[in-house]
UniProtKB/Swiss-Prot annotation:
Residues 5-239 form the ABC transporter domain. The complex is composed of two ATP-binding proteins (NrtC and NrtD), two transmembrane proteins (NrtB) and a solute-binding protein (NrtA). It comes from Synechocystis sp. (strain ATCC 27184 / PCC 6803 / Kazusa). The keyword Cell membrane applies. NCBIfam families: ntrCD. GO terms for molecular function: ABC-type nitrate transporter activity; ATP binding; ATP hydrolysis activity. PROSITE patterns: ABC_TRANSPORTER_1 (PS00211), ABC_TRANSPORTER_2 (PS50893). Belongs to the ABC transporter superfamily. Nitrate/nitrite/cyanate uptake transporter (NitT) (TC 3.A.1.16) family. This is Nitrate import ATP-binding protein NrtC. CDD domains: ABC_NrtD_SsuB_transporters, PBP2_NrtA_CpmA_like. Coiled coil: none annotated. Contains an ATP-binding N-terminal domain and a NrtA-like C-terminal domain, which are connected by a segment containing an abundance of glutamine, alanine and positively charged amino acids. The N-terminal domain is required for activity and the C-terminal domain is involved in regulation of the activity. It catalyses: nitrate(out) + ATP + H2O = nitrate(in) + ADP + phosphate + H(+).
Length: 670
């Protein structure tokens, strides 16, 4: 069903006198139903009024668009009426004449008696019959605002836009007008969008509260559903069981934004450096020998690092993901290709470690994994997840062991998700063993494990050695999931902003190169070199270039999305996807779920830096969706209720919620 109003990936950028630009709003996406009351809240300067102006047609988006009833809004119109904080009444006209001005202009085709009736009805609607012949100078502030509301409603609009309508009024008048507005909206069924700083006002009036982050590049940080039934009365709202929890969540969000550390100066500094004027040109970047290390290899071998001024990039081949994490902690590595959850895990101090604030400005690859089982399961007829559950249930005293590469890896999280969706508890019904990717096949052959979830080429290696078969690829579980990301210490990014920007640009171009299939054979030859993956192209090729053989009865087939580096906005560091990872780490007890999850996700996942790199390359500023995530079992993840999502699972560990004060962590590390 088409939404009544859709704000479709809107950016608003203002030019600056020095030739620069200020990105006020970034990637605003919101769908509004007819008759809904939406409040926009956030700190001053977050773009609330700018967004309202674009809905009204008084301003236009730089990118994206605002759609109402299937038509793009390009100019003001009488179906969208605005009520401003400053009333905007003509001082020489009476109450009646101010309202008549709107009616006579918009509804001029109606007979005069009908126009007069509309004017009278709206004066009565706001209770100003006795003041109808007074001028604005004779009215109180509250009465003036009632005139403004009556004038807006008199044109029979479909949408009422309120820009802090009660901000200048005393508390008693404000309260009375809020009650009256609720009654008017209830009677008229008009759709309302209101800008406010007052959290109590937002809760009283709204169906949903849209909370904007602090600018620049403000975006929707959280959307709060207000499940308080209508019609509402102030006392009943305050006494509702959810009122103080909702109010606390809004206040907490605003406090998070107040203390959030903003790094908007990065782009200006980077531009000022010019040319190859980077702060640091010699970098040590860690990687693991897997097929999807291709972007790093291509950036090195094809000269993308040098093109962007990074003259001395050393790719450090590490034995395990733990070694990558240790290298970052010890500052032996400047950065690394990381499993998708590692920047969050390091930031939160997963595993009892000292928290280390991290940044990821791009996803380097998507997909590329599979779940491989020992051939003994194939011989027992295990072809599906349900077959596996039944087989494991036959021998409850013999617990099978599966290998995974790192707790914060998508291999671990997707393997756990897959098992749990089949009623197999990954902590009770099976044993998960942490192993480096290159050691999976040898441990399978030795009988130390009964299967594993890992990236290529190790699944194909097991298949070709007739040691195992693939029961599922990650395309079967979550096609398009983030797999590897660029991980950097936050303090490093702040210290070397121009260098970080150059690194992201080089890797973006390398990712684009990787997803041109005409280059895949060349890249395959690079990957096979000893300093990189160091194994035969026979094992690296499946899924990357040639058909993927799962080692079962099925024919080998081309899986064009199996290794995804650039297409379909692959590189965008989606905050929704980062939040999904956070829920899974908490679901399995690896971390306490951070109470200030909005702040954590905003600090770690950095689409602003990604967008800056795209703009420097002359590319469109790609934007991901503030979207729901749905895996193969149909369970929908909604970013606005992460805790509720975890609790909907039948199998999960006890969930603890803790506040992580990231700025204090940063000071300790420095």
């Amino acid at each position: 069903m088409m939404p009544f109003i859709e704000i479709d990936h809107v950016d608003r950028i203002f030019p600056l006198p020095d030739g620069g630009r200020y990105i006020a709003l970034k990637n605003i996406e919101l769908k509004i139903s007819q008759g809904e009351f939406i409040s926009l809240i956030g700190h001053s300067g977050c773009g609330k009024s700018t967004l309202l102006n674009m809905i009204s047609g008084l301003d236009k988006p730089t990118f994206g668009g605002v759609i109402m009833e299937g038509k793009e809004i390009t100019e003001p119109g009488p179906e969208r009426m605005v009520v401003f904080q400053n009333y905007s009444l003509l001082p020489w006209l009476t109450v009646r004449q101010n309202i008549a001005l709107a009616v006579n202009r918009v509804l001029r085709d109606l007979p005069k008696p009908e126009q007069e009736k509309i004017i009278d009805d709206n004066i009565a609607l706001v209770g100003l019959q006795r003041a109808a012949h007074k001028r604005p100078g004779e009215l109180s502030g509250g009465m003036k605002q009632r005139v403004a509301i009556a004038r807006a409603l008199s044109t029979r609009p479909k949408v009422l836009l309120l820009d802090e309508p009660f901000g200048a009024l005393d508390a008693l008048t404000r309260g009375n007008l809020q009650e009256r507005l609720m009654e008017i909206v209830q009677e008229s069924g008009v759709t309302c969008i209101m800008v406010t700083h007052d959290v109590d006002e937002a809760l009283l009036l709204s169906d949903r509260v849209v909370m904007l982050t602090t600018g620049p590049e403000a975006h929707i940080g959280q959307i709060l559903e207000v499940p308080i039934p209508r019609p509402r009365h102030r006392l009943e709202v305050v006494n509702h069981p959810s009122y103080y929890a909702l109010r606390g969540e809004m206040v907490y969000f605003l406090n998070q934004q107040k203390r959030a550390k903003k790094v908007g100066a990065v782009s200006q500094f980077a531009e000022a450096m010019g040319g190859n004027g980077l702060e640091k040109i010699n970098l040590d970047l860690g990687f693991i020998p897997l097929t999807d290390c291709a972007p790093l290899v291509v950036a090195k071998e094809k000269g993308f690092f040098q093109k962007h001024g990074l003259e001395q990039v050393n790719l450090v081949k590490e034995p395990s993901w733990q070694a990558i994490a240790d290298g970052i902690r010890e500052r032996r590595l400047d950065g690394a290709q990381m499993v998708a959850g590692m920047p969050l895990a390091l930031t939160l101090g997963m595993g009892g470690k000292t928290p280390l604030p991290m940044v990821t400005a791009m996803v380097m690859s998507r997909n590329g994994n599979a779940i491989t089982l020992s051939k003994k399961f194939a011989e027992a007829g295990v072809k599906t997840l349900e077959d596996l559950r039944l087989k494991l249930a036959e021998t409850p005293d013999q617990v099978s062991t599966l290998g995974m590469v790192h707790p914060a890896s998508m291999q671990n999280l997707l393997l756990r998700y897959w098992l749990a969706s089949g009623s197999i508890d990954p902590d009770q019904d099976i044993n998960l063993m942490r192993l480096p990717p290159p050691q999976m096949v040898s441990n399978l052959e030795a009988g130390n494990i009964d299967g594993f979830c890992v990236g290529e080429p190790w699944n194909s290696y097991a298949v070709k050695q007739n040691l195992g078969y693939v029961i599922a690829t990650d395309l079967d579980i979550w096609n398009g999931h983030p797999e590897k990301v660029l991980g950097m210490r936050e303090e490093w990014v702040n210290k070397y902003p121009a260098t970080h920007l150059a690194l992201v640009k080089a890797l973006l171009e390398a990712c684009e190169y990787c997803d041109d299939r005409r280059h895949r054979q060349e890249i395959l030859d690079y990957l096979a070199l000893p300093q990189y993956v160091g194994t035969s192209t026979e094992y690296i090729s499946p899924g990357f270039l040639t058909e993927y053989d799962q080692g079962n009865d099925a024919e080998a087939e081309m899986l064009l999305d199996f290794n995804q580096f650039y297409v379909k906005q692959s590189n965008y560091p989606s905050r929704s996807e980062g939040l999904w990872i956070l829920t899974q780490l908490a679901r399995w007890g690896y971390i306490d779920f951070p109470k200030n999850w909005v702040e954590i996700i905003e600090r770690v996942r950095r689409p602003d830096l990604f967008g800056e790199a795209c703009r420097h390359l002359g590319w469109p500023d790609l934007e991901g969706d503030h979207h729901n995530v749905s895996l193969f079992d149909g369970m929908v993840f909604t970013p606005n209720d992460p805790l509720g999502y975890i609790k909907r699972f039948t199998i999960h560990r006890d969930i603890q919620v803790t506040e992580i004060l990231i700025d204090q962590i940063d000071q300790v590390n420095q």
